[in-house]
């Protein structure tokens, strides 16, 4: 293609949404992606007929921007049951949303996961987080999530047996130092909609977005070495020019391209996928570890959500470990199997390890203060813009929003009508 109007560095969700908004306004785009495919962290690998999402991820269907940008019907979404199965003191306890699963309300109320008062406060928390608009959440007084939960009146019991393992699996932060604003936003999204997986894996989300761009708009295997005046230089020396450049990469890579040394620290995770013949749990619930044991924090069985995640007659188990582990794959597999045999019995020894994912930058640290993702967009220069998690909060919702807003800033800078 001839020189595009806009060069976008990175074909993750932010970059793709930015490109689509630019195309809607008649601007030509070229996305340069260093890896071999679109999606950024939202990728799925196919191994021996199994679909392995790169790190445990779900689509929260209440995300407003996802509702605007995605065709849920075409994604063929499959849903987790609302709630969790919590491992505590050698037993499993069902902890479900009584408003969605009234038949399980009594079991949840009588479980040792929190007091009766705690469970009543969860209803109050749901009401609190669903008040006002999303911008309102990011204007409320900010604290750590742990401080917020304690101030709300929750006991140490429910904090340690539910909130800590659950939120550790969401934000990869055992200390619950994540901003209370992020917690309120996340809790609102979980309570307002479903947690789902596309039938063909999380990769279906970026692939759906990419399919709406003209052929030739995306170039993979194109790593950008540096940003130049209204253009970029690729590794290998090729220079590409446009009227504007948008950097839509992960935070550390964006900082590198901008020449900034003050890089926001990251939260890492390790994920192990196993194949098995019989699922260790009977229904599509998230399993949370409230015993404080190592290494697994949470697990799920994606095939109970969407059978297409595995070949016929087999099941897939996805485990999540907080942080990146230094052990080799065999040693880590042994640790995980030993732990899970205590949960599910000796049959775990027959599970077959499919792959280990070590993701050092699973999310940026999101401790207070966090930026308001609804604030007016600020460009870096008259022709250079950023979007995604760089100096912003991280979630699928805000990745999409930041891409759209970056595109609108570019359109205004290039004097195009919105």
Q: Which residue ranges define each predicted feature?
A:
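Mobile amphipathic helical/loop "lid" adjacent to a hydrophobic cofactor/ligand pocket
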Residues: 63, 67, 71, 76-176, ...
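N-terminal Rossmann-like FAD-binding beta1-loop-alpha1 element of flavoenzymes
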Residues: 4-31, 411
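Mid-domain catalytic core of redox enzymes
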Residues: 225-334, 338, 342-343
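Helical element adjacent to the flavin cofactor pocket in flavoenzyme catalytic cores
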Residues: 183-233, 240
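Conserved flavin/dinucleotide-binding core of flavoenzymes
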Residues: 308-418
């Amino acid at each position: 293609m001839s020189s595009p109007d806009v060069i976008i560095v990175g074909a993750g969700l932010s970059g793709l949404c930015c490109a689509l908004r630019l195309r809607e306004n008649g601007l030509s785009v070229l996305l340069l992606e260093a890896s071999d495919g679109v999606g950024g962290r939202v990728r799925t690998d196919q191994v021996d007929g199994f679909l392995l999402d790169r790190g445990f991820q779900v689509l929260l269907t209440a995300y407003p921007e996802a509702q605007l940008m995605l065709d849920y019907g075409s994604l063929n979404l499959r849903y987790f049951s609302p709630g969790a199965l919590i491992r505590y003191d050698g037993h499993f306890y069902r902890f479900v949303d009584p408003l969605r699963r009234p038949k399980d309300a009594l079991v949840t109320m009588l479980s040792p996961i929190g007091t009766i008062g705690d469970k009543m406060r969860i209803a109050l928390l749901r009401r609190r987080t669903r008040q006002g608009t999303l911008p309102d959440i990011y204007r409320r007084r900010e604290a750590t999530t742990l401080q917020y939960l304690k101030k709300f009146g929750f006991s140490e019991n429910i904090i340690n047996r539910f909130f800590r393992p659950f939120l550790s699996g969401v934000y990869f932060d055992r200390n619950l130092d994540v901003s209370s604003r992020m917690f309120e936003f996340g809790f609102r999204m979980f309570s307002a909609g479903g947690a789902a997986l596309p039938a063909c894996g999380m990769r279906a989300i970026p692939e759906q977005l990419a399919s709406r761009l003209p052929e030739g708009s995306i170039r993979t295997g194109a790593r950008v070495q540096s940003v130049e005046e209204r253009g970029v230089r690729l590794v290998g020396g090729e220079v590409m020019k446009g009227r504007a450049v948008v950097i839509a990469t992960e935070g550390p890579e964006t900082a590198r391209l901008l020449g900034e040394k003050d890089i926001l620290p990251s939260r890492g995770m390790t994920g192990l996928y196993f194949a098995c013949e019989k699922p260790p749990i009977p229904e599509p619930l998230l399993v949370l570890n409230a015993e404080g044991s190592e290494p697994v924090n949470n697990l799920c069985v994606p095939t109970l959500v969407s059978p297409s995640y595995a070949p016929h007659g087999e099941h897939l188990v996805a485990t999540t470990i907080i942080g990146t582990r230094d052990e080799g794959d065999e040693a880590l597999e042994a640790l995980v199997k030993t732990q899970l045999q205590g949960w599910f019995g000796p049959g775990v020894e027959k599970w077959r390890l499919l792959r280990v994912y070590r993701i050092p930058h699973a999310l940026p640290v999101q401790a207070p203060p966090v930026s308001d993702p609804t604030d007016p967009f600020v460009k870096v220069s008259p022709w250079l813009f950023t979007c995604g998690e760089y100096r912003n909060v991280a979630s699928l919702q805000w990745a999409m929003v930041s891409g759209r807003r970056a595109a609108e800033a570019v359109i205004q800078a290039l004097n195009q009508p919105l």
